[in-house]
Amino acid sequence: MAAGKPFILENNFENSSREPLLRLLERHDYQAITLTLTGDYRRIYERFLLRNAGPERHRGHVVNTCYPELPGQPAEAPLTYEQFVDGIRARGMDSFTANGPRIVVDTTDFAALDVPGLVQRLARCAEEILQAQRSPEK
């Protein structure tokens, strides 16, 4: 931000992240576009379980108690569907918005995503932000 360049900041943003992020955005006079990836919670939960069970998933992203796991330690049970959804809602992951436009993308079916349309929406939002920054009223 100090360089004044556009950038992408990717994270599972949640309510606890909002105030510190807003302070940074204000300090550096940035407006952020929030891109919320959501969809049918059941389908997302199923993908979550598959990803966590896969060999390519680093165990540090799966284990919430102690990593590396202690020898002989029983495997941690995966979150239930209800715990998964409650976590999303309680942490504000589906409602998080920074200080600018918010685009909600349904990722239930990846094949149905309109990627070119999404890129156009992002470009329009970015251009509107840049135009507002250049306006004499600012």
Label the predicted regions.
Residues 14-15, 41-42, 112:
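Alpha-helix N-cap/helix-start and coil->helix boundary motif
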Residues 112, 119, 125-131:
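C-terminal alpha-helical "lid" subdomain
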Residues 54-116, 137:
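Small-molecule kinase domains that catalyze NTP-dependent phosphoryl transfer to phosphate-bearing small molecules
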Residues 26-51, 105:
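Conserved phosphate-donor/acceptor-positioning beta-strand/loop module used by diverse small-molecule
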Residues 18-20, 46, 114-115:
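Short glycine-/acidic-enriched loop or helix-start segments at secondary-structure transitions
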